[in-house]
Amino acid sequence: MDKYKVAGKFGLPDITVAEMESLASFCEAVLPSVQPPPEELSGEGDNHRNKEALRSFYSTSGSKTPVLRQSIELVTKRGTIEAYIATRLILFLLATRLGTLLICGTECLVSRWPFVEKFSELSLEKRERVLQKQFKNWILTPIRAAFVYIKVAFLFCFFSRVNPNGENPAWEAIGYRVNPDENKPSETHNERPLEKGIVETMEETEQTLLESLAHKGLEAVLDTEHDAIRIKCDVVVVGSGSGGGVAASVLAKSGLKVVVLEKGSYFTPSEHRPFEGPGLDKLYENGGILPSVDGSFMVLAGATVGGGSAVNWSACIKTPKSVLQEWSEDQNIPLFGTKEYLTAMEVVWKRMGVTEKCELESFQNQILRKGCENLGFNVENVPRNSSESHYCGSCGYGCRQGDKKGSDRTWLVDAVGHGAVILTGCKAERFILEKNGSNKGGKQMKCLGVMAKSLNGNIAKMLKIEAKVTVSAGGALLTPPLMISSGLRNRNIGKNLHLHPVLMAWGYFPDKESSNISFKGNSYEGGIITSVSKVLSEDSEVRAIIETPQLGPGSFSVLTPWTSGLDMKKRMARYSRTASLITIVRDRGSGEVKTEGRINYTVDKTDRDNLKAGLRESLRILIAAGAEEVGTHRSDGQRLICKGVNENSIQEFLDSVSTEEGAKGMTEKWNVYSSAHQMGSCRIGENEKEGAIDLNGESWEAEKLFVCDASALPSAVGVNPMITVMSTAYCISTRIAKSMTTGLSH
């Protein structure tokens, strides 16, 4: 039974065999061995599906798969302390008769001694009923949340895992196959454009690190007094994403010696794999499984060289004029009303190689566009930082073709070309602050650099990077905790966190010869976002935008509502021809992140109403495009069969759409929100009461400490924010460069 041994965490003991038996019984109820529905094998389903693969998929039991250990390891490694403790408690209770009685009630009672069965002894039918009841349990919501954690971890591992050959036994049945043409490496796949300036600390020792730093032109020596490696430079930039890459480029090109710290790793196109599990694990914060504290949100944030720009879905949308007006006039931040900012957007647009057309749209974007056209709704092209012919559905796992021009292939290349050095596998621990003798601008402290640590266990010494100017660009989730851990106390640090909350609608479009409407491709193929529709209010204000997502099999299964084992398998069997539309709102509400990995956020009522409007419009679009069935991801499996349905029935269905938040909410029905955009948690403000940084991007408390990432934005943007983040960083870093190279105060 050692194969089940998984180390404990947060002071709890190792996972026991009894707990693993509870987990196996739970997972069997989630994905039981069942007979496939006759229509799945009779030819009435999708044409492309292999019938033998379907039989094998339906007969597979969740308790018999090798992913049980991976599932509990995922909760252990990626879950919050609340999720981990709740999961362990539930598995422990289900391994006992008394605990099973407390959770399962009368389902576990039998007429023979000892009159109560453990969860693993219950029949499959009883276990399924227990899950169904608990997913509706609006009183003991912590129990429900724990059930959700286990379900999410298991399904994600089951559908995203790959063997060394890049295979998963479930993929053929659900119609998922990686397109070799779409995912072939570029002709320059061996190119390492950052090689000249990269130092990968994970491959170094303390001695070789010193040699590598010196080879890159840096002054690096052992500081025995502080047991550190001391590195001197003009500017240190913490983070290499949309903001950090731009800042590094601008500052290096102005003749300054720049060091960039990146805790993630560097990958070239040929090193990317077009698979969800490995891609999320190596390129995203917390392996792509980053929940809010209460579990109501799943958050995606890049954690590699290039940051979010290396893994985003290529959308390049300029800051809306209405947002610029609000920021410049209502919030009194002049920058956003200047020619300086408009020029910055053009510079960014050009350097990113943005194109405004798409030669061939993906399955999902075809459906979005067709549905909008049939309804007379607005639909627009979404510019991308790729070629017009770029047809890649796996850019979120790193662009294997090298066509997408993220920061790692643009701004950082420029920076390295002008002498910048990038340290990967290197995490900033705190800023080096001292009392400001000059008290310039009323700032009590002055920043002298960063204390950082390599994630390589062979490098025990801290890295002390001494710099004239320090730029924090770790993103809206990491900049606030870093500033707080350094001793900064501005009340805005970590607050005003905007997430662009997302809910999704789906529509099933079977690939049938008899169908009058045919959309080419599959849900996971082609350009991810090439079309957008705006949801407008009666006075033409934008309430939400509708786009299309990248959903690998694992993510799709996590978001899909579970109502029974058979239903779950039927939904997954339709994966490749299920189109998803995402509703994104410019959130008026906000949350906070003051400790790394601890995201607190509650959706504002106005934002929920706008999400509801977007969901309803998404469903109408899917129906108008010819979907056979549509629905939402609400926990009760809300859906509508479209064949022969009349307008009254459609309207009744749309009226039932709701946006309740999270499994811990006191409602029977609930949703899991998503977020791929995080902003505003160290926002610019006209004074220290309104913002964490001043109008030039400098900390109100510490001289020479600047912020150049999405946390600096005054509020949510309402559209994909990459261009806004880069343009803001361009303006701030240009001002820094001017100040440093002229010796004049800004």
From Swiss-Prot:
EC number: 1.1.3.20
Coiled-coil boundaries: none
Entry superkingdom: Eukaryota
Keyword Membrane: yes
GO molecular function, one term: flavin adenine dinucleotide binding
GO CC, any one term: membrane
InterPro entries: FAD-dep_OxRdtase_2_FAD-bd, FAD/NAD-bd_sf, GMC_OxRdtase_N, GMC_OxRtase_C, Long_Oxdase
Subcellular location: Membrane
Binding-site positions, FAD: 233-248
Keywords, sorted A to Z: FAD, Flavoprotein, Membrane, Oxidoreductase, Transmembrane, Transmembrane helix
Major place of residence: membrane
TM regions (residue ranges): 139-159
Biological process, per Gene Ontology: alcohol metabolic process
Pfam families, alphabetized: FAD_binding_2 (PF00890), GMC_oxred_C (PF05199), GMC_oxred_N (PF00732)
Annotated active site: H677
Catalytic reaction annotation: a long-chain primary fatty alcohol + O2 = a long-chain fatty aldehyde + H2O2
The UniProt record lists the keyword Ribonucleoprotein: no
Family: Belongs to the GMC oxidoreductase family.
Role, per record: Long-chain fatty alcohol oxidase involved in the omega-oxidation pathway of lipid degradation.
Protein name: Long-chain-alcohol oxidase FAO3
Gene: FAO3
